[in-house]
């Protein structure tokens, strides 16, 4: 089988590097690298929930996605300068939010909010899938932080891991984890978000340059899910290390009666 321009086989991911504790202030901070794509993912904990969520006893999770002006080869203006978010930015922010809410019991948070921020430092295709994969690790660290602070009603509110990967048809071949060079000329382009329990969270797929058969869809999903298994292993390896920051001291346990 012939190799791709970057030397990979069709089913191979780019090198994946997950660095926890990349910045100090958030409860969770992760730099994730999919090859040349680099995304900083942070998870911040704040007391309270949106107004429409108050008095429910439920927590909330929201996410924002953005790209640095120089993340691509040509600098672009910050969207804050333009005065409005692009449709793409809003779409990806909502995708990250939906993906992570699929794995957490919001009731366990109490009326607290976890805010996920994903900032693309360097873009070479697959920024949204890298953001989701890295944001899960940041979320897991934020949950550890909340648990140490005694703010969780359930010490294990995460029901599964979440990862995402791009897959597509390029030059008539099914390939996974497309860099920009492949993504820009793909006949079929798809993003798959999955759990480590074998279920799917979201599938975004389009025939960019051609229609595709049901059998091709099945092959795309098979390759994407196989790649997600590799990403889950990378997440587990990263999270096997100790929490990278200083954990808060929770409230003391209640005294036993008569002591």
UniProtKB/Swiss-Prot annotation:
Reactions catalysed according to its record: tRNA(n+1) + phosphate = tRNA(n) + a ribonucleoside 5'-diphosphate
Q: For this chain's UniProt record, which GO biological process terms are given?
A: rRNA catabolic process; rRNA processing; tRNA processing
Residue sites binding phosphate per the record = 88, 126-128
Give the superkingdom in one word: Bacteria
Sorted keywords for this record are: Nucleotidyltransferase, RNA-binding, rRNA processing, Transferase, tRNA processing, tRNA-binding
Matching NCBIfam families, A to Z? RNasePH (TIGR01966)
Q: HAMAP family given for it?
A: RNase_PH
Concerning its family, UniProt says:
Belongs to the RNase PH family.
What is the protein's given name?
A: Ribonuclease PH
Species of origin: Mycobacterium bovis (strain ATCC BAA-935 / AF2122/97)
Lineage, opening ranks: Bacteria, Bacillati, Actinomycetota, Actinomycetes, Mycobacteriales
The gene is: rph
């Amino acid at each position: 089988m012939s190799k791709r321009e970057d030397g990979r086989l069709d089913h191979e991911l780019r090198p994946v590097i997950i660095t926890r504790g990349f910045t100090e202030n958030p409860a969770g901070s992760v730099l994730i690298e999919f090859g040349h794509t680099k995304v900083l993912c942070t998870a911040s904990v704040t007391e309270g929930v949106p107004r429409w969520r108050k008095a429910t006893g439920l927590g909330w999770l929201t996410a924002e996605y953005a790209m640095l002006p120089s993340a691509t080869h040509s600098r672009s203006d910050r969207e804050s300068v333009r005065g409005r978010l692009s449709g793409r930015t809003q779409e990806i922010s909502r995708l990250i939010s939906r993906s992570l809410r699929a794995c957490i019991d919001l009731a366990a948070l109490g009326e607290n909010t976890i805010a996920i921020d994903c900032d693309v430092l360097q873009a070479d295709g697959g920024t949204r899938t890298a953001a989701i994969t890295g944001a899960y690790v940041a979320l897991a660290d934020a949950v550890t932080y909340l648990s140490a602070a005694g703010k969780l009603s359930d010490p294990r509110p995460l029901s599964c891991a979440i990862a995402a990967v791009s897959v597509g048809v390029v030059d008539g071949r099914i390939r996974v984890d497309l860099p920009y060079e492949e993504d820009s000329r793909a006949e079929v382009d798809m993003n798959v978000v999955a759990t480590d329990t074998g279920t799917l969270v979201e599938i975004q797929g389009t025939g960019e340059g051609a229609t595709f058969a049901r059998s091709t869809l099945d092959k795309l999903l098979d390759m994407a899910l196989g790649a997600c298994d590799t990403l889950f292993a990378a997440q587990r390896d990263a999270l096997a290390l100790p929490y990278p920051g200083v954990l808060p001291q929770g409230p003391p346990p209640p005294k036993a009666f008569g002591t």
